[in-house]
């Protein structure tokens, strides 16, 4: 733990790392405040900041020789088998750590690896290689199962705690498992933080992008006051500002054989309105719509658009073009609407809901992994990151207002490597509510652009229904389709 004055060079380095964003740190009084250049306060500079050799320092950090927190249950024959790219990551990590040890730098590394890379199994291999007692911290209970499976495969003694940290502390008085798998809210307990700081050497922060370490959170405080000897941040979409806490990054590109297609399903709608819609439209320009809350609420009650989404999904699913579908909404009521309507069509053997308010949802997710055909309806908050259903082959994005990090994480749900190579994403840029027409079109175009430019998707026009119609279509219908295409091209 290093308390330093905020000199110009230090401030400039921190500012560059956060891409010019405001910097907040703990000061010498323990207050979490925004850092100003030339401040008279001393600030607690996170240990992980010094992991990069580009940061000059005279500080000397402890090495692993000063602790004896070694794994007792390790069996080298249980080490997981890795793909060549995963082995390359391990090689890079080991090489970097040797340099860090030689230079007496903190052993803190961010593994910036694409969705579907296999971060969990790769990290378990590293964990077994290091042979040090480990704490795995996840943002929610949904991620527990995939870690449990891999840790058990390696044969490591472990303990899972997702509820009360007090009961866990009582158990730790009599036993100290080699691996602790916990949810991040456990870090609000100072006694628990002190315990793992003393008895564990490796801290793994899964889905590190879900934490904004420029906020005064439990994870921020833990990394500042109780840092372990070693640390991995795992993410496919790193937050720039989080580098202050883990300032060494390994990023290896992943080549994929997946055939990834994104369809923009357009339609021309007559203007649609209700009393509720007119009431919400009045709030579009108010401060309460700063984060487009009412924009998304309007989408959730846009009946013609909702029907288009349902019609598209039903037709594609019935045709066998897609088989394992994830339907994502922003709002819970929107999720429930789609769930109920799909349930009426396909029944409970096919349609499932990923509801954060249902404690049994994680068990349900496990149960559908091996199904050949299913439709899983959930929210962006619950299933947009970390959802572990590798067999998903298609994604329906029913919302529009999504930031770039969320887009990349969400599309990653259907980019896991399996024997089946086709992956399909459907987005819906049209709306029948004229007041949000251009806003929705722009947001959906951003989803398309990121998927194509960064994630290797190919955009294709969704006109299968029109093209499959008989040639002897009435002239009026053909004219309507032509006008529809012209309208939507102008809209985009």
From Swiss-Prot:
Subcellular location: Virion
Keywords associated with the record: ATP-binding, DNA-binding, Helicase, Hydrolase, Late protein, Nucleotide-binding, Transcription, Virion
Protein name (record): Transcript termination protein A18
Assembly: Interacts with G2. Might be part of a transcription complex composed at least of G2, A18, and H5.
Family statement drawn from the similarity comment of this UniProt entry: Belongs to the helicase family. Poxviruses subfamily.
Function: DNA helicase which seems to act as a postreplicative transcription termination factor. Involved in ATP-dependent release of nascent RNA. Forms a stable complex with single-stranded DNA, and to a lesser extent RNA.
Residue span(s) of domain Helicase ATP-binding: 100-256
GO cellular component terms, A-Z: virion component
PROSITE patterns: HELICASE_ATP_BIND_1
Highest taxon in the source lineage: Viruses
EC number: 3.6.4.-
Biological source species: Cowpox virus (strain Brighton Red)
Keyword hit for Ribosomal protein: no
InterPro entries per the UniProt record, alphabetical: Helicase/UvrB_N, Helicase_ATP-bd, Helicase_Restrict-Modif_Enz, P-loop_NTPase
